[in-house]
Amino acid sequence: ADLGAEVIKIEPISGDPLRANKVGPLVSGGSAQFQTFNHGKKSVSLDLKEENDLDKAKKIALSSDVIFDNFRPGVMEKFGLDHASLVKDHPALVSISLSGFGTISPLAKNPGYDLIVQALGGGLSINGHEETGPAHIPFHLGDTAGGLYAAIAILAAVQEAQKTGFGRAYEVSMLDSQIHLSGDEVTFSGLDGWLSRPHGSGHPALAPYAVFQTADKPIVIAAVGAEKFWLNFISVLGISHLSEDVRFIDNSKRSMHIEELTNIIHKKLKVKTRDFWLKELGKADVPVAPILTVDEVCLLYTSPSP
């Protein structure tokens, strides 16, 4: 909808359950969460079990470029709203089905909640610390990734339909989307038997690439994109001799000795404050950032520019 499409959301007669969610701030007396996900959309309330309402849904589908659903597999076919049923009267129609686990998985009929997808897709296993175990990724990774990949599929499918006059049916699964976002972890594990483990506040294959504590507040340092960042970093910290230490000669070696390196860095950073290091490392072109709270982020990016 934000890109200019007319989006018609079909809700049950009682409305999307998210409308009634009163957790957090309200917008005009309604759910702020619902507004976040649905602003710009039009809404129609229909009972698809009623023939008259089902006919209305079919008319909407046949007048649209794309029909998108997030039902469990088989539901759209039951209502005659699947691509095979509609394409006879609308050859250019694009159908996108987003589900938790796709249509042929043994889990196909299972409910696809975000936390379940995080668990089954490996995301939980690499989040958190080894001492405390897996931790919930505190945003809707599976939900959001599935929606984004579905949006990409829609854009590509509409382009094809406009060129050929024929639409297709596509499936997107939240689980596949979350696994794809795991990136290197899946690649390494699949090819070389890489043993994934919780990343804690850094990355086991990158160093220094982590959260570090200063004298007062933590910062993030990512001095691994190019060797010059590493050299600039250790120069600012006054430990340039590490460039000749065989344990830290390159990222591969630094990753193998990450605990030793982390201890050295922490010892240096804890002498000065966060703001001091942000200034000095920034001047040296070292990738560094403060760790902002969500409140600080909202204030920073909604405040008028000076």
Task: Show which residues each predicted segment covers.
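N-terminal helix-loop segment corresponding to the beta1-alpha1 unit
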Residues: A1-F166
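Glycine-rich beta-alpha junction loops
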Residues: S14, G100-G102, M174-I179, D216, ...
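Short Gly/Pro-enriched turn/cap motifs at secondary-structure boundaries
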Residues: F34, H199-P204, Y209-V211
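Conserved Rossmann-fold dehydrogenase catalytic segment
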Residues: T103, E131-F139, Q162-Q178, R197-P204, ...
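Oxidoreductase and adenylate-handling cofactor-binding alpha/beta cores
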Residues: G147-G167, H180-L191, I234-S240
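Aromatic-enriched alpha-helical interface/lid elements that frame and gate functional surfaces
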Residues: P208-A284, V288
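Conserved PLP cofactor-binding pocket of PLP-dependent enzymes
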Residues: G282-L300
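Conserved small/polar residues in nucleotide/adenosyl-binding loops
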Residues: Y301-P306
